[in-house]
From Swiss-Prot:
Belongs to the UPF0381 family. Gene3D superfamilies: 3.30.70.860. This is UPF0381 protein YiiS. The gene is yiiS. Pfam families: DUF406.
Length: 99
């Protein structure tokens, strides 16, 4: 990896972060199945806490979710809308801590 960085820096390569993060998509969707409704609700509480910790204190994240009872399992569908795409990316990376 160091060789790539050295070659890139000697040739003057650069990337505009606006090319990567353009704020077109600020919503993260999440879906998971659980054995019980209580497990789904408990996990949703953790997701809300994570979204609150990730989002800016002024605006916060907009959260919409549904918990559906299906035969033998419960489905959690959630959407988290952040004020900017960077917050959404940080939130999605933070989901790894809940795995």
């Amino acid at each position: 990896m160091k060789d790539v960085v050295d070659k890139c820096s000697t040739k003057g390569c650069a990337i505009d972060i606006g090319t990567v993060i353009d704020n077109d998509n600020c919503t993260s969707k999440f879906s998971r199945f659980f054995a019980t409704r209580e497990e789904a609700e408990s996990f949703m509480t953790k997701l809300k806490e994570l979204a609150a910790a990730t989002s800016s204190a002024d605006e916060g994240a907009s959260v919409a979710y549904k918990i559906k009872d299906l035969e033998g399992q419960v489905e959690l569908d959630a959407a988290f809308t952040f004020s900017c795409q960077a917050e959404m990316i940080i939130f999605e990376l933070s989901l790894r801590s809940l795995a």
